[in-house]
């Protein structure tokens, strides 16, 4: 750097070559500039490249081979006439300093402190590499004929052992001799494989679009093909096919039943069962504790007369509570709800209106011939269950 800057540069007027000699001495500087700042201590700063992989002892990080550092170089000794240099550098990942020095005896570098070597060395003999002949052995081969003959026999036996391996290597090299043909064959195989992959992708896309699938399909295997060959699928009938099948069944069906008697008996039995069910429901609905009488329903019978009665006589009759009944009429006989409904239907409108106005307490009294000590429980007046009394008019009947 100093020479480059000093050559063809400015020379001051007071520069004397005999006195100063060079521009560096004139400027009182070193040609290496900052690299020679510790030159008085015998230390020169150089650019050092890591010879192998190591681990830093300070940060425990890996430092690869080929990483460069600004290292302080100094001489620490000699191996015979070969100087031994030591290099001190700072780790770029921490504040730890690493020291290494040369090993001329083994043509290697040795770590002094600050790091640990990643062991990747091997024995050349174990690795079947060519070993260098030592100087003493080389001189002995040149001077001693018997030693040279023995050494030759050992070399020939080693060659016989390595011959199969060497022949295999030669065959492999000859197979790759024509690189153009190999490249053409490789590209052709690649095109065929690419075309097959494109066809398979198109089939997968068509299947996904047909089945509305959004999942990726895995490649088909031989087991899948064998399993698919064993399966059998039945197609579902459409609506039109089902309708045709129904029409065919209806057309092929017989118009007449196979056993008319059996069908008639089955229909009659079903009707009988329905009637029995209705009767059972009616029995559950009607009370069966005591018979219903005329007194329970509040119906009063009047004897029919040829001459219509006056309204005053009718009112007196209702007030006295002793209606005149025709002979042979039993007032206290039980009356069914069906009889009541028929009698009410035959009653004229005027009689029904009068009966509705009558209260439930104006019930008929028992006949005089009956003793009051033992009244009939059916003739005793009971509360009206229909809410209003009914008066039956038998004016058009045939009773005397």
Swiss-Prot record:
Feature: compositional bias, Polar residues: 283-292, 327-341
Name of the protein described by the UniProt record: Probable splicing factor YJU2B
Domain of life: Eukaryota
Coiled coil: 182-214
Its job: May be involved in mRNA splicing.
Organism: Bos taurus
GO biological process terms, semicolon-separated: mRNA splicing, via spliceosome; response to virus; RNA splicing
Keywords: Coiled coil, Nucleus, Phosphoprotein
GO cellular component, one term: post-mRNA release spliceosomal complex
Phosphoserine: residues bearing it: 40, 310
Keyword Hydrolase: no
Similarity annotation: Belongs to the CWC16 family.
Location of the region described as Disordered in the Swiss-Prot/TrEMBL record: 1-26, 255-400
Pfam families, sorted: Saf4_Yju2
InterPro entries found in the cross-reference section: Saf4/Yju2
Locations listed in the record: Nucleus
Keyword Glycoprotein: no
Compositional bias of kind Pro residues: 364-380
PANTHER family per record: SPLICING FACTOR YJU2, SPLICING FACTOR YJU2B-RELATED
């Amino acid at each position: 750097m100093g020479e480059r800057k000093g050559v063809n540069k400015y020379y001051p007027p007071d520069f004397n070559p005999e006195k100063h000699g060079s521009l560096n001495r004139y400027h009182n500087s070193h040609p290496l500039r900052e690299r020679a700042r510790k030159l008085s201590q015998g230390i020169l700063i150089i650019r050092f490249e890591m010879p192998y992989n190591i681990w830093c002892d300070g940060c425990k990080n890996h430092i690869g081979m080929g990483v460069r550092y600004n290292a302080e170089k100094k001489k620490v000794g000699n191996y015979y006439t070969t100087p031994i240099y030591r290099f001190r550098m700072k780790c770029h990942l921490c504040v730890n300093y690493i020291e290494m020095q040369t090993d001329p005896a083994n043509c290697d570098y040795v770590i002094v402190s600050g790091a640990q070597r990643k062991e990747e060395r091997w024995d050349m003999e174990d690795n079947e590499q060519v070993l260098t002949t030592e100087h003493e052995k080389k001189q002995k081969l040149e001077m001693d004929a018997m030693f040279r003959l023995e050494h030759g026999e050992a070399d020939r036996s080693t060659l016989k052992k390595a011959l199969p391996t060497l022949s295999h290597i030669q065959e492999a090299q000859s197979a790759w001799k024509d690189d153009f043909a190999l490249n053409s064959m490789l590209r052709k195989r690649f095109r065929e494989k690419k075309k097959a992959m494109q066809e398979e992708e198109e089939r997968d896309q068509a299947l996904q679009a047909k089945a509305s699938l959004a999942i990726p399909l895995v490649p088909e295997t031989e087991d899948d093909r064998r399993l698919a060959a064993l399966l059998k699928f039945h197609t579902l009938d459409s609506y039109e096919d089902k309708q045709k099948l129904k029409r065919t069944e209806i057309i092929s069906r017989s118009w007449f039943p196979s056993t008319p008697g059996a069908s008639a008996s089955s229909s009659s039995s079903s009707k009988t069962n329905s009637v029995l069910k209705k009767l059972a429901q009616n029995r559950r609905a009607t009370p069966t504790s005591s018979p219903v009488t005329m007194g329970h329903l509040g119906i009063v019978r009047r004897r029919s007369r040829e001459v219509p009665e006056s309204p005053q006589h009718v009112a007196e009759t209702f007030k006295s509570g002793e209606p005149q009944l025709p002979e042979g009429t039993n007032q206290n006989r039980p009356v069914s709800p069906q009889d009541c409904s028929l009698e009410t239907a035959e009653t004229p409108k005027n009689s029904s209106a009068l009966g509705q106005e009558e209260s439930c307490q104006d019930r008929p009294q028992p006949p005089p011939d009956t003793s009051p000590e033992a009244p009939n429980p059916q003739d005793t007046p009971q509360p009206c269950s229909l809410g209003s009394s009914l008066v039956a008019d038998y004016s058009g009947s045939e009773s005397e």
